[in-house]
Swiss-Prot record:
Protein's name in the database: Protein transport protein SEC61 subunit alpha
Gene (UniProt): SEC61
Residue intervals annotated with topology Lumenal: 55-76, 141-146, 268-361, 435-440
Membrane topology: Multi-pass membrane protein
Protein family: Belongs to the SecY/SEC61-alpha family.
Cytoplasmic-side positions: 1-33, 98-119, 168-246, 383-415, 459-471
Length: 471
């Protein structure tokens, strides 16, 4: 790679890529809230607009496992969700962290080229992904659709992906709060939880027509049943529909994550160049935030997708069956693994199922905790947040750890950061497992990603003085 500047290859494309100009002055917090709301509204509208030209299908969704974490909605303009942005960002984070590409983030020109390269790669990924979706028959047999409709579908998907990329850039450049990726994922999850709690629609699961929303059903049962005790028991324990026990579990997981967000180790630091009061460098328990569970979910989802596709093509192959055997569940069109490696990577659907197969439950718990800890400890090395990277930042900013020699900063940070990263990753995994086993209204991964994102917005508001930071 010596002498080769990968980023320079991107320069010719710069004039042709749409870009959000950075604000010339600081954007007021109220305006940031407004732009964030506008961005969110556009995302929600796009999630409800169906793709023009598709043949509706009730077949099992091979991408079912990825939709939640990628803010994707099947058959809509948000079919690709944030997949191109996330994939491009992680690839370039890996390339930059491992120094496979030469980039100096201290130089404005390099930062701009790096961002342009990410955007270009995201557009290329969206084009490739859209083409694969159409040609593999996700929206109907290509021969039946015709060349014109196939091209139109690809155009819609790529254009929608470009809009999402620009919405994310709008927030990242300082017009809004946080990032589009976190906002869209959290919104998708919160929308799912809200619907399961308050849905006014009625369904029949063999017990007569019932309200789908847990709270709506609870109120309805209290007002229509003479035996209030039985009404409450039914509202908390009803099967195949959201119930109040799941809602209470969801609230408890939310509270636990928010509580654990406050756990941190404060390292006292001071300037090595001038006298002054001590500051602190906080190392949070969730040092890598929700990234470990996001990566674990991505790994699991991709294995599920590959396993399901292979099983459909080669259902009798021994190696394919070892990876996973798939079958439907009663009352559901979606396929689920019933044996093989994929089966042990899938969380039990409830506590009853977990107790019925304790071997699977133990393997699943060990898998999630172990993978989250490894991902968390590994990510700090390639994301610029390792002890060596932080010690380098201290040196550049003229900071030293109070009561320690300047040269011992790395040793002190190495003692704390990797432990916090690994333990924090395992804790995130444990919360996710608890949520899955106790049967919350969303997956453990989804709830954790939503809470950490919402808490991040709370911290932004506290920093601006809009809420009490001590809450």
């Amino acid at each position: 790679m010596a002498g080769v500047r990968f980023l320079d290859l991107v320069k010719p494309f710069t004039p042709f890529l749409p870009e959000v100009q950075a604000p010339e002055r600081k954007v007021p917090f109220n305006q940031k809230i407004m732009w964030t709301a506008v961005t969110l509204m556009i995302f929600l509208v796009m999630s409800e607009i169906p793709l023009y030209g598709i043949n509706s299908s009730d077949k099992s969704d091979a991408l079912y496992w990825l939709r939640m974490m990628l803010a994707s909605n099947r058959g809509s303009l948000m079919e690709l969700g944030i997949t191109p942005i996330v994939s491009s960002g992680m690839v370039f984070q890996l390339l930059g962290g491992t120094q496979l590409i030469e980039v100096n983030m201290d130089l404005k020109s390099d930062r701009e080229l790096y961002q342009t390269a990410q955007k270009l790669f995201a557009i290329i990924l969206s084009l490739g992904q859209a083409t694969v979706y159409v040609l593999t028959g996700m929206y109907g047999p290509p021969k039946d659709l015709g060349v014109g409709v196939c091209l139109l579908l690809i155009f819609q998907l790529v254009l929608a992906a470009l809009v999402v990329i620009l919405l994310d850039e709008l927030l990242q450049k300082g017009y809004g709060l946080g990032s589009g990726i976190s906002l869209f994922i959290a919104t998708n999850i919160c929308e799912q939880i809200f619907w399961k709690a308050f849905a006014p629609t009625t369904v029949n699961k063999g017990r007569g027509y019932e309200f789908e929303g847990a709270i709506v059903a609870f109120v309805h049962l209290l007002f229509t049943r003479k035996d209030k005790k039985r009404a409450i028991i039914e509202a908390f324990t009803r099967q195949d529909l959201p119930n109040m026990s799941q809602l209470v579990t969801t609230v408890a997981i939310f509270a636990a994550v928010i509580y654990l967000q406050g756990f941190r180790v404060d390292i006292p630091v001071k300037s090595s160049k001038q006298r002054g009061p001590y500051g602190v460098f906080p190392i949070k328990l969730f040092y890598t935030s929700n990234l470990p569970i996001m990566l674990q979910s991505a790994l699991t989802s991709n294995i599920f997708i590959i396993s399901q596709m292979l099983f459909k093509k080669f259902p009798t192959n021994v190696l394919v069956r070892l990876l996973g055997v798939w079958d439907g569940r009663e009352g559901m069109q979606q396929l689920f693994p019933v044996s093989g490696i994929a089966y042990y990577m899938q969380p039990p659907f409830n506590a009853k199922e977990a107790l019925a197969d304790p071997v699977k439950t133990v393997i699943y718990i060990a898998f999630v905790l172990g993978v989250c800890a490894v991902f968390s400890a590994t990510w700090i090395e390639i994301s610029g947040s390792s002890p060596r990277d932080v010690a380098k930042q201290f040196k550049e900013q003229g900071l030293v750890i109070a009561g320690r020699r300047e040269t011992s900063a790395y040793k002190e940070l190495k003692r704390i950061i990797p432990t916090a990263a690994a333990f924090g990753g395992a804790t995130i995994g444990a919360l996710s497992v608890a949520s899955d086993l106790l049967g919350a209204l969303s997956s453990g991964t989804g709830i954790l990603m939503a809470v950490t994102t919402i808490y991040g917005y709370y911290e932004m508001a506290a920093k601006e003085g809009y809420v009490d930071a001590a809450i």
